[in-house]
Amino acid sequence: MVDSLWHGFADMGSVVANGRFVVARGEGTRIWDTNGNEYLDATAGLWFTNVGHGRTEVAQAVADQLTKVAHYSGFGDTTADITVELADRLGDIAPV
């Protein structure tokens, strides 16, 4: 695996010497590596898993949206209807 995947932020010398930390699954705030060891996912909220792993209602909402449109650029004066809907909902609850 070390030969086929070089992550841009990894210390590859350490990976070669000590092996790679590979996550196999997650549930809520916990993750498990490929050896079955369980960890608290302390970096879950870093980008996009701040709602936890394995949330079937989130997976279903994503699947539903992907059948409509996966992504549309917000550059210029274009956007997607779901983006407008989210902005309106956030505007309704944001303390501004």
For each predicted feature, which ranges?
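Active-site-adjacent loop/helix segments that line or gate small-molecule/cofactor pockets in enzymes
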Residues: 1-27, 68-69, 77, 82-83
